[in-house]
Amino acid sequence: MNKIDHRINYILMLDTETANTLSGENGTLDMSNVLVYDLGFAVIDKRGTVYESASYVNRDIFVYERELMQSAYYSNKIPQYVEDIRNGNRKMASYSEIRKAIFEVVEKYNIKVVCAHNSRFDVNAVNITQRYLTKSKYRYFLPYGLEVWDTMKMAQSVIFKQKTYREFCEKNGYLTKNNQCRKTAEVLYRYISGNNEFIESHTGLEDVMIEKEILAYCFRQHKAMEKVLYPAPLPKPIEEEDIYCFEDYLKYL
């Protein structure tokens, strides 16, 4: 095992795929009760170098909530997951085992930051799943004290200000109905990689690998940028020693 360089500010890049994705009355997706069945993460630095990675399938949802799995937005990928588990490309584990693995890697690398693309969704998803599976006995999934970054905020600060990105979106039809450039990881990666044929996998670890490239690209521009979704919280509440407690500090923002 390579020796850990404690001069590096390691980052935990995270991505989730979820079930229980319900359609609202107007056809929009209701993401308020999503449940994580796929969680991938990688330990990276600001250059996008990967030091460790893992791909987990949450047994508690994937196996024990088979009916809910049919509501997954990418339920057509279920056979692929089964094959990946069989050939060792993904590890089946309980949600508590996945959480333990994250706690261990955060401690191992002294990680202070967790990052995702549209991280509000992923942070909410892991917490909703934690509450669902423990009947709210345990409410927060991530280790307490992490700062939460969002590559979507980074891209809006850096990539969206590039004239060439606007031209790229106009040329390829990557504009919203409000004539704004799209900010999906897939479109952003197509732009920074020069591969306009790229198709996002929509599986946890594979998506982490493109999102860390968005992060690295933004840092390479050496521009001022917004990146923090949730800053590191206030000192840990004595009565809640092992949770990521947003409510205790969001009111101070």
Feature-to-residue mapping (PLM):
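Short helix-to-loop capping/linker segments positioned immediately adjacent to catalytic or ligand/cofactor-binding
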Residues: 110-116, 137-138, 196-202
